């Protein structure tokens, strides 16, 4: 059952989804009902967003474990709507048993990550189940019975899916996190992406003695750092298109030495002062090349040739192949100066490194 809730974003009608926290709460409630002898195909839960979700439940069963304890078990499949969420389609399971003290004890099992660093939402060693989902789970199972429950949340796909998330960088290993502050996934939430970036920076501040940070837009740049001894050991944060927001936050946290490593497609924009590199914000890649070529005395034919390219990758490679890669170095220095102006601090130590997929980093 798909969630019939939509938002309008940049003129597009996008479908919302529900969080892993909502899945866990619904699965736990269903498992508690099963433990009491009920059968169902869906359960209703309240969300912090003020919406009531009616979520389909699957893989329902009741049984006794080896010591004779009665167990209820159920699963809910995550629906991320139109959000590009790596956990979309994953099954979140709950396994519950009764207590007699009215308490609800919640833990994570297979596929649920464990906290490995201080400064997150729980203690080191605890299951990566955020506070709001914990509250949702407790609220829903206590609707079924006031006896209390032991609740184990697990996901057989979680260990593999967790590798595709930001988890390891923020101090969660071994699986996915059960998250969500509203219970609803709002598509392409820029705030959510930025909060993840900020959380990574906070994690580095808490757990690293390094006073320098490496910011990369994506996975390829992170892998490329292995080729540079000067940055190979730097704590790294993937910042997507949010260069300005990430720089400002890192600077506010005391980082005064920062290296940025990125593809020419994004950093051409940065070289002329574009700090959100999403193509809907600005597409000034060729304009950047034209500016730096003109400033360094390139002839009209060269400028026109570069301006006619469709991608920044082509332009980068053309400059290398025609031995005018000094323009690329000028773009790196230009980006560094733009960052200092953006942060209003000329004393910063900023290093910008630009690469192409074909030639890698320029020497």
Curated annotation (Swiss-Prot):
One Pfam family per UniProt: CbiD
Lineage of producing organism: Bacteria, Pseudomonadati, Spirochaetota, Spirochaetia, Spirochaetales
Presence of keyword S-adenosyl-L-methionine: yes
Record key words, sorted: Cobalamin biosynthesis, Methyltransferase, S-adenosyl-L-methionine, Transferase
Example GO BP: anaerobic cobalamin biosynthetic process
Cited InterPro entries: CbiD (IPR002748), CbiD_sf (IPR036074)
Family: Belongs to the CbiD family.
UniProt name for this protein: Cobalt-precorrin-5B C(1)-methyltransferase
Enzymatic class: transferase
Gene3D superfamilies, per the entry: CbiD-like
Reaction(s) catalysed (UniProt annotation): Co-precorrin-5B + S-adenosyl-L-methionine = Co-precorrin-6A + S-adenosyl-L-homocysteine
GO molecular function: cobalt-precorrin-5B C1-methyltransferase activity
Pathway: Cofactor biosynthesis; adenosylcobalamin biosynthesis; cob(II)yrinate a,c-diamide from sirohydrochlorin (anaerobic route): step 6/10
Known EC number: 2.1.1.195
């Amino acid at each position: 059952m798909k969630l019939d809730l939509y938002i309008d974003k940049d003129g597009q009608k996008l479908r919302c989804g529900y969080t892993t926290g909502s899945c866990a709460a619904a699965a736990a409630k269903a498992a508690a009902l099963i433990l009491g002898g009920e059968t169902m195909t869906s359960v209703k839960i309240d969300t912090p967003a003020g919406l009531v979700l009616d979520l389909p439940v699957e893989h329902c069963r009741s049984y006794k474990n080896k010591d004779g304890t009665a167990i209820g078990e159920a699963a809910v499949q995550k629906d991320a709507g139109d959000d590009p969420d790596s956990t979309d389609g994953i099954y979140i399971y709950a396994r519950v048993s009764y207590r007699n003290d009215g308490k609800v004890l919640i833990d994570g099992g297979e596929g649920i990550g464990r906290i490995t660093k201080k400064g997150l939402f729980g203690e080191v060693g605890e299951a990566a189940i955020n506070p709001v989902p914990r509250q949702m789970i407790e609220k829903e199972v206590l609707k079924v019975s006031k006896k209390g429950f032991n609740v184990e949340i697990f996901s057989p796909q979680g260990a593999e899916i967790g590798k595709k998330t930001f988890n390891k960088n923020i101090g969660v290993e071994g699986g996915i996190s059960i998250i969500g502050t509203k219970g609803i996934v709002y598509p392409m939430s820029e705030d959510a992406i930025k909060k993840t970036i900020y959380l990574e920076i906070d994690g580095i501040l808490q757990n690293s003695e390094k006073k320098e940070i490496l910011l990369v837009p994506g996975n390829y740049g992170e892998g490329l750092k292995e080729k540079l001894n000067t940055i190979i050991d730097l704590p790294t944060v993937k910042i997507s298109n949010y260069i300005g927001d990430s720089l400002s936050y890192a600077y506010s946290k005391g980082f005064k030495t920062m290296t940025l490593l990125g593809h020419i497609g994004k950093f051409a924009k940065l070289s002329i002062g574009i700090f959100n590199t999403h193509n809907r914000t600005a597409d000034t890649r060729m304009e950047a090349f034209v500016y730096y070529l003109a400033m360094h005395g390139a002839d009209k034919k060269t400028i026109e040739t570069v301006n006619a390219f469709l991608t920044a990758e082509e332009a980068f490679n053309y400059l290398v192949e025609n031995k005018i890669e000094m323009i690329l170095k000028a773009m790196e220095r230009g980006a560094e100066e733009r960052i200092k102006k953006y942060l209003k601090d000329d004393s910063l130590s900023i290093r910008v490194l630009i690469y192409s997929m074909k030639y890698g980093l320029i020497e």
